[in-house]
């Protein structure tokens, strides 16, 4: 495809127009008095949301140069969402301010690379100052406040706090759509995986259609079991102990399955067979997780074990096992606490080093099954549009809560950023254009508070000046219209969210102000554009709009 190019001021200002177009749409949502944005979609109902990243992802501009700028701003929102799960609107507002002030400096003759160095130094200082101010999140009340601020709903805050209270800080919280109105919290106790019994003949409770085993042995095998003589020795040992048995294997079929079913029907002994969760290497890892949790061994040739040589010492134990048609839940496994803790540490290390989002998600699920539990928040609404909006807010609130637990909290409402500008007052010892770079960040940090105030119908600059005169931790509560101790009032932001917003905004702004040329694909020209005037009052001649610089 042929390309078209533009250079210098034209290029940078085209990018700025694109950043402004996206930021102007997003920033009307910031703060408790922010508005919603309605987005038309090519399929289904329109989306109504105040979630910055959702809005950003759906914005495409017609002008190819300006669209490049919008895509850069979109990257700020998506990267912040990936790292912290919230703060996407704040990040976009910061990026717009940094780009505006940065380009003014470039136009005035400042060296772009020196500005970039100053911006990077300022971000590092701001990040360190925010971490220093951070207050650890430990109480249920604080967790509820973080979630409530993000979702703008105290009921959501209480529900998320209850979930974390019950499943622990490493547990997983998922948000699902419900057919009924309102919010509902369901907690999964112990380890659960999405495989049910192989045969309904294993059911022990006809009413609930569940197989329930008390004080059970657990046999873990990564392959298929079909021959009875392979498992007969261990079955005889389990029968002598008068204990139920859970068999988890890739598959159980043929003679082995029919024998287990017959014994289950005759109540000779209690047994349930289920397929192992996952596939390939992930299946092996999940089986090993279950082995650690139950205190057993995975019966595999790699560790010198074969099915016909298994003893009771190789089996895991569980106080209770509940198996239904679709899921298996192991409650109170008999594994050593130290072994489980070691496995948890190993999984956390793998999560930190993984560079794949999918792998990280699956590792996080495994961690949750071992370390905490799984809480499912089901959300319902009267219409599909409202349901999507509620689900977005819930997902943001869950992410914000996780971020707060990880790094702590600071005052919300844009106050923490307005106060932290004081660490940049001395210019960090920089001079010349690097000092100008520091000042770009210092000025831009006021933008979120400015827009929170403006969305509340107030003069942003006046509110910013007043907040800077207050003590750290104090600021303007736009929900009540009062200047107050924001932390005491529960107006708080996770440090991780705030730091990520600043860092990602600065990263894109620094790249944009050092841009000197743009290269885009030349738009395809339709046949109708080559015609001549047909007397309808519209030009169909050869005059085509050109991008900046042409």
Swiss-Prot record:
Q: Return the annotated region ranges for Disordered.
A: 524-550
Task: Offer one example of a GO biological process linked to this entry.
Answer: protein refolding
Catalytic activity, EC = 5.6.1.7
What Pfam family is a match, any one?
Cpn60_TCP1
Residues reported in the UniProt entry to bind ATP: 29-32, 86-90, 413, 477-479, 493
Compositional bias of kind Basic residues: 533-543
State the source organism's domain of life.
Bacteria
Q: What is the protein's quaternary organization? A: Forms a cylinder of 14 subunits composed of two heptameric rings stacked back-to-back. Interacts with the co-chaperonin GroES.
What job does the chain carry out? Together with its co-chaperonin GroES, plays an essential role in assisting protein folding. The GroEL-GroES system forms a nano-cage that allows encapsulation of the non-native substrate proteins and provides a physical environment optimized to promote and accelerate protein folding.
- Protein name, as recorded: Chaperonin GroEL 1
């Amino acid at each position: 495809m042929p390309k078209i190019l533009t250079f210098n001021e034209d290029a940078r200002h085209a990018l700025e127009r694109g950043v402004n177009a996206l930021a102007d749409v997003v920033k009307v949502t910031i703060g408790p008095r922010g508005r919603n944005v309605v987005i038309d979609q090519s399929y289904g109902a329109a989306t109504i949301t105040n979630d910055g990243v959702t809005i950003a992802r759906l914005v495409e501009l017609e002008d190819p140069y300006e669209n490049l700028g919008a895509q850069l701003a979109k990257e700020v929102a998506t990267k912040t969402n990936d790292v912290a799960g919230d703060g996407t609107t704040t990040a976009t507002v910061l990026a717009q301010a940094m780009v505006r002030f940065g380009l003014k400096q470039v136009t005035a003759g400042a060296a772009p690379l020196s500005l970039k160095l100053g911006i990077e130094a300022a971000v590092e200082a701001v990040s360190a100052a925010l971490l220093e101010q951070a207050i650890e999140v430990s109480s249920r009340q604080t967790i509820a406040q973080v979630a409530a601020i993000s979702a703008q709903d105290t009921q959501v805050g209480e529900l998320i706090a209850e979930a974390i209270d019950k499943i622990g800080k490493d547990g997983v919280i998922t948000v699902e759509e419900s057919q009924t109105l309102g919010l509902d919290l369901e907690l999964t106790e112990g380890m659960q995986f999405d495989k049910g019994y192989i045969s309904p003949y294993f059911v022990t409770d006809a009413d609930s259609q569940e197989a329930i085993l008390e004080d059970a042995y657990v046999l873990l095998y990564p392959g298929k079991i079909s021959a009875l003589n392979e498992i007969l020795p261990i079955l005889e040992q389990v029968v002598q102990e008068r204990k139920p048995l859970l068999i988890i294997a890739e598959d159980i079929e043929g003679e082995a399955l029919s024998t287990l079913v017959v014994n289950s029907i005759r109540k000779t002994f209690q047994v349930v067979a289920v397929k192992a969760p996952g596939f390939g290497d992930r299946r092996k890892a999940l089986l090993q997780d279950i082995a650690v949790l139950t205190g057993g061994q995975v019966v595999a040739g790699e560790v010198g074990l074969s099915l016909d040589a298994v003893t009771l010492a190789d089996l895991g134990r569980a106080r209770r096992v509940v198996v239904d048609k679709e899921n298996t839940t192991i409650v109170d496994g008999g594994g050593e606490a130290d072994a489980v803790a070691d496995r948890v540490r190993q999984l956390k290390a793998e999560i930190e080093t993984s560079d794949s989002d999918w792998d990280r998600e699956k590792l996080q699920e495994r961690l949750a099954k071992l370390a905490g539990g799984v809480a499912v928040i089901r959300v319902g609404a009267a219409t599909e549009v409202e349901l999507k909006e509620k689900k977005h807010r819930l997902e943001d609130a869950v992410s914000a809560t996780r971020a707060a637990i990880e790094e702590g909290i600071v005052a919300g409402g844009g106050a923490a950023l307005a106060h932290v500008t004081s660490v940049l007052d001395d210019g960090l010892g920089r001079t010349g254009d690097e000092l100008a770079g520091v000042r770009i960040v210092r000025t831009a940090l006021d933008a979120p508070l400015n827009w929170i105030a403006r969305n509340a119908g107030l003069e942003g600059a006046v509110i910013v000046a007043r907040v800077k005169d207050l003590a750290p931790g104090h600021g303007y509560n736009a929900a009540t219209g009062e200047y107050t101790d924001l932390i005491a009032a529960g107006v708080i932001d996770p440090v991780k969210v705030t730091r990520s917003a600043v860092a990602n905004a600065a990263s894109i702004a620094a790249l944009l102000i050092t841009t000197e040329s743009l290269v885009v694909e030349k738009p395809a020209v339709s046949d109708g554009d080559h015609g001549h005037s047909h007397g309808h009052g519209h030009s169909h001649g050869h005059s085509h709009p050109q991008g900046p610089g042409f």
